[in-house]
């Protein structure tokens, strides 16, 4: 499966298919050269010279980058020149080894092309200078995305961690106690499988409304949970609150839950609307998906938080679709109910005999897909 369990459009991290393709390309090229009957010494010389030229071109490029970094040596590297050199040139041992090996083969093997070393170096420098000036070797969007994902440079990564540490990690541990207090005050309004969880809505288009009833009139605000306060970043008694909503179906209440949007999606939407952020709608969609995936990974490593919340990820509907947000939420609630019933099938089925009618009623747990009725006269 190449996507997250939250939603089919959320991708998993990239794998190693590029290396697999490179290995296949290596085998194909070696087979082609072997079939052409290329002499091994001639093949080795050209291969070494080509590898050396690639590394030399890369070295020229990084030296040009070093010229820029030296202008920022104090604010970026605290005046440490060796850090600046390592940041631009990478490992000097690797370059030294490649250059020494290349010089050895250049001297020891016959020079069939009859070109002096100085001429070759000058042409390499010329070609790399043109590449830099014309921008011919810029990274593709896929390469940039891969680097950002691997090194956690994405906007989504910071937003997900900020959302978890600054909000979810604070409210989720005490959520059940607050729901219990709420039920005591409101005649057990929150009941059922989803009564002890926070349901977080993730519209992938980042369309977050301040009023859920405006998104769907079948979602009706009921009450606020008891508030939670904490001293946070110099703010004494900072208040955190959550809202209880009632879900309607055909005009009748069919469920209640603690519900809200993921607020960082508002930040992504605002960035895409502000030209100063340089954030396109495509960037917004990509970062929204990565935000969901990153938060899913964070919660997977925090079981106490994970069991107290559920993420509801969905695509905003088109004009032709009959999408209903309330039905999407109800689908998740009912799915959890079915999962609870399925988990209960591991229990033992107890069938009361004729002599047990005077005893206290016992819970009947079915081994079927649907729960059995509690009446026994129909068996």
Curated annotation (Swiss-Prot):
Q: How is it modified after translation?
A: Phosphorylation by TBK1 leads to activation and production of IFN-beta. Following cyclic nucleotide (c-di-GMP or cGAMP)-binding, activation and translocation from the endoplasmic reticulum, STING1 is phosphorylated by TBK1 at Ser-366 in the pLxIS motif. The phosphorylated pLxIS motif constitutes an IRF3-binding motif, leading to recruitment of the transcription factor IRF3 to induce type-I interferons and other cytokines. In contrast, lacks phosphorylation site at position 358, leading to reduced production of type-I interferons and other cytokines.
- Cite the residue spans of the region called C-terminal tail (CTT): 340-379
Q: Where is this site: Not phosphorylated?
A: 358
Q: Which residues cross the membrane?
A: 20-40, 87-107, 115-135
Which residues are involved in binding 2',3'-cUAMP? Answer: 167, 238, 263
Key word Hydrolase present in the record? no
Motif (pLxIS motif) positions are: 363-366
Q: What membrane topology was assigned to this protein in its record?
A: Multi-pass membrane protein
Where 2',3'-cGAMP binds, per the record, is at: 162, 167, 238, 263
Q: Please give the residue positions where the record annotates the modification Phosphoserine.
A: 355, 366
> Is Zinc a UniProt keyword of this protein?
no
Catalysed reaction equations from the record: H(+)(in) = H(+)(out)
Q: What does this protein do?
A: Facilitator of innate immune signaling that acts as a sensor of cytosolic DNA from bacteria and viruses and promotes low production of type I interferon (IFN-alpha and IFN-beta). Compared to other mammals, STING1-dependent type I interferon induction is strongly reduced in bats, suggesting that the cGAS-STING pathway promotes a limited inflammatory response. Innate immune response is triggered in response to non-CpG double-stranded DNA from viruses and bacteria delivered to the cytoplasm.
Protein's name in the database: Stimulator of interferon genes protein
- Which organism's genome codes for this protein? Eidolon helvum
């Amino acid at each position: 499966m190449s996507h997250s369990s939250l939603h089919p459009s959320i991708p998993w991290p990239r794998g190693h298919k590029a290396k697999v393709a490179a290995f296949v390309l290596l085998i194909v090229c070696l087979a082609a050269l072997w079939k052409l009957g290329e002499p091994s010494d001639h093949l080795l010389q050209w291969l070494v010279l080509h590898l050396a030229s690639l590394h030399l071109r890369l070295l020229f490029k990084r030296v040009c980058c070093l010229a820029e970094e030296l202008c920022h040596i104090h604010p970026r590297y605290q005046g440490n020149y060796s850090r600046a050199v390592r940041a631009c040139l990478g490992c000097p041992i690797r370059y030294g080894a490649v250059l020494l090996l290349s010089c050895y083969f250049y001297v020891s093997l016959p020079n069939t092309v009859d070109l002096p070393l100085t001429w070759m170096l000058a042409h390499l420098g010329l070609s790399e200078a043109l590449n830099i000036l014309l921008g011919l070797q810029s990274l593709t969007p896929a390469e940039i995305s891969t680097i950002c994902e691997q090194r956690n440079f994405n906007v989504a990564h910071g937003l997900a961690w900020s959302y978890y540490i600054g909000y979810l990690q604070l409210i989720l541990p005490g959520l059940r106690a607050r729901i219990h207090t709420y039920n005591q005050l409101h005649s057990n309004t929150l009941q059922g499988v989803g009564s002890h969880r926070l349901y977080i809505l993730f519209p992938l288009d980042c369309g977050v409304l301040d009023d859920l009833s405006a998104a769907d009139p079948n979602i009706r605000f009921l009450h606020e949970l008891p508030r939670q306060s904490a001293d946070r970043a110099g703010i004494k008694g900072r208040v955190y609150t959550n809202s209880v909503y009632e879900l309607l179906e055909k005009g009748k209440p069919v469920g209640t839950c603690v519900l809200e949007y993921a607020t960082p999606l508002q930040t992504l939407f605002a960035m895409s609307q502000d030209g100063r952020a340089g954030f396109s709608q495509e960037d917004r969609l990509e970062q929204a998906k990565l935000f969901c995936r990153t938060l899913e990974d964070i919660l997977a490593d925090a079981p106490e938080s994970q069991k107290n919340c559920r993420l509801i990820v969905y695509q905003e509907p088109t004009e032709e679709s009959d999408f209903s947000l309330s039905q999407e939420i109800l689908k998740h609630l009912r799915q959890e109910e079915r999962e609870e019933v399925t988990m209960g099938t591991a229990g033992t089925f107890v069938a009361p005999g004729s002599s047990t009618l005077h005893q206290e009623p016992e819970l009947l747990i079915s081994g079927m897909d649907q729960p059995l009725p509690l009446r026994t006269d129909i068996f």
